[in-house]
Amino acid sequence: DDRLASFSSTGPTVEGFVKPEVVAPGGHVLGLMGTNTTIAITHPEYHDGGAYFTMSGTSQAAGVVTGIVALMLQHSPWLTPDEVKCRLLSSSQLAIDGEGNLAYSLFQQGAGLVDAYAAVYSETTGCANQGLDVAKDLAGIEHYCGRARRDEYGNYTIEGLDTFLWNDAFLWNDAFL
């Protein structure tokens, strides 16, 4: 239905990272499900009585993103996890309203709606997880926090910038976060 679900999580995280990183179709997704499953029995109104069931949630959106990643790796099997993330983020499209403004804040849509074709054929590199070293973080040497902050009025901003993140959407896609 091309709308952000009312139950979608929003960011930033406690550690100041923008979440979600991307969004994908996950509402009212028609999928295969047997008639004898607990969900089908508990909610027959969503089951067609045959092989299909309508569901919504991150479990549905995760399948869409996973499918795109599988296509990316089939096309370019040498991609590292950071390169996959970079291409997935940089190829996503922000939701824009009829007046050319963001339909949702970047704390609601991240880099935007995933685009399978653009992600598979992207050649973008070096834009995900810059400077993050998980080994140092786990060893307690260096801890990483995002730049998102909440002010005393409840507004989210990005540390070091004079404007709100959702007014400067390019910051996300150009990997300055």
What annotation goes with each model-predicted range?
Residues 26-105:
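Hydrolase catalytic cores
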